[in-house]
């Protein structure tokens, strides 16, 4: 009997220990319900209260909630709702790896289309973790004259009475007259005349619903998520699959003088997209958050963009970003083939001359204007989430500006040149410019007064000179 009592006692102690450990683990994984940190008072504040103060735990299921926006006396910002009469919205989680962090990103859907802090009316918005990369990347989208680039506004957020820090309230990517302004194709469309346009898709690297997957080459697949339309008929699904098989086939054509891929893809938009990824040194540019859209018309093509989820690796560039190693194994799609086409390289050069250096130099003042005023809010955010307090707004601004300067100067010296360049007549305006010599990797290795001078000073090898492949013996 004594042995039985001792056994029961031991089991009880063990269970108590398990419960204690489990509760401790749970508490450690959940941020405190009430933060000891409060708003900085330097930015508008977005107050959100879910029904019954229910926690937001799902990326799929919206919770009903109410909101109000307090401008905090900032000129030009309109208040929305009041404490006594808040406005309706729905809220859920969003993101892939970002959702795993302590500070969560959110997707919100307002009760009606509303203009917030000067941004055009819409129901759909995102609350994103603020980074200097977002500030720089989205402004570069405007500088590069992309078809449409999301806007954002910094806000501090109080969720269910708890201060959760600094966020960027950001326009989400949707087909809408104020966003991706193209024809909106209906779900379950079967009319073949209407299926060929009104598409918004994303080259993705995560398994999800609403996707098709086709072989890109002998080594990896190409996965596309269709955002709009979202619920496809068999006819829509077949058209989209056939379309991207055809696009992929033309891009991977062994004949890199072919123009077949240009019948599907807008070359200029792809060149602008490429330049932006290089200036940012964003290794995710061609494998995740790589959006394409297509309008409905007889001559419509796939437009690269909008841009989203931009990072900057802040490293010394030694090659094009899509060729440089990163710590994860996702594969960049298409760009390794596209960069071999002469039409693409020429478009890159034309656009670069349009933006470099004057337009690109505008980014540095913009970064200071946007990032430095966030200092107090960023400090409170770091305290709230126990992040490094040394990451001041000034440090963040200097870091991204220094990275952009390095990337811009590197790219200016390494504009891509196709080894399959056509023997086209050099335009009159270019005849008096220095003769630039490139190796087969597309790197400029020198400038000379003439082609003859270049050839007399080069070692044995194969070079690209005046858009011609020349072998020096």
How would you describe each model-predicted region?
Residues 10-22:
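Bacterial N-terminal signal peptides
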Residues 27-135, 139:
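Conserved NTP-binding catalytic cores of kinases and kinase-like/nucleotidyltransferase enzymes
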Residues 429, 460-473:
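C-terminal tail/sorting-segment detector
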Residues 444-458:
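Glycine-centered tight-turn motifs at strand-turn-strand junctions
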Residues 109-115, 122-124, 128-132, 146-150, ...:
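Internal "kinase-insert"/substrate-recognition segments embedded within catalytic cores
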Residues 416-439:
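Residue-level detector of functionally pivotal "anchor" positions at catalytic/ligand-binding pockets or at interdomain
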